[in-house]
């Protein structure tokens, strides 16, 4: 069966200094509960990895970004939201398939920041 990553909400508006929570639900448990990453993408730029193994912060990424969850339910939280956080965020699940690893992206969440 096709693996589906469902992200909610599809769009969210936040005030500067506020908090944003993005959810990612997988139709199949993520391999080893750790192969879940979060990416940030801005227009005209390649995706930037923020979180890997569900909760590990990538090098150089602000600690305002926090990842949590396991199995089929994962969350990305952004605290003390800044204008520079305006972007689209994606979860990426890695699944162990008999034919090899399979990667599936969520549909994305647009974060709009209001001053």
Curated annotation (Swiss-Prot):
Residue numbers spanned by region Complementarity-determining-3: 92-104
Region (Framework-2): 38-52
Any one biological process term the GO annotation gives: adaptive immune response
Segments for region (Complementarity-determining-2): 53-59
Framework-1: annotated span: 1-24
Region described as Framework-4: spans on this chain: 105-114
InterPro entries cross-referenced by the UniProt entry: Ig-like_dom (IPR007110), Ig-like_dom_sf (IPR036179), Ig-like_fold (IPR013783), Ig_sub (IPR003599), Ig_V-set (IPR013106), IgV_Light_Chain (IPR050150)
Region listing for Complementarity-determining-1, in residue ranges: 25-37
Additional note from the record: This chain was obtained from antibody to type VIII pneumococci and was isolated from the serum of a single rabbit.
The protein's name: Ig kappa chain V region 3315
């Amino acid at each position: 069966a096709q693996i589906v990553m469902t992200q909610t909400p599809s769009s969210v508006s936040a005030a500067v200094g506020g908090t944003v929570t993005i959810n990612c639900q997988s139709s199949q448990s993520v391999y080893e509960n750790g192969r879940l990453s979060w990416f940030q993408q801005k227009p005209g730029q390649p995706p930037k990895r923020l979180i890997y193994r569900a909760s590990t912060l990538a090098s150089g990424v602000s600690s305002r970004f926090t990842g949590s969850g396991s199995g089929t339910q994962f969350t990305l939280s952004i605290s003390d939201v800044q204008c520079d956080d305006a972007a689209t965020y994606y979860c990426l699940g890695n699944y162990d398939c008999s034919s090899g690893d399979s990667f599936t992206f969520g549909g994305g969440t647009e974060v709009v920041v209001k001053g």
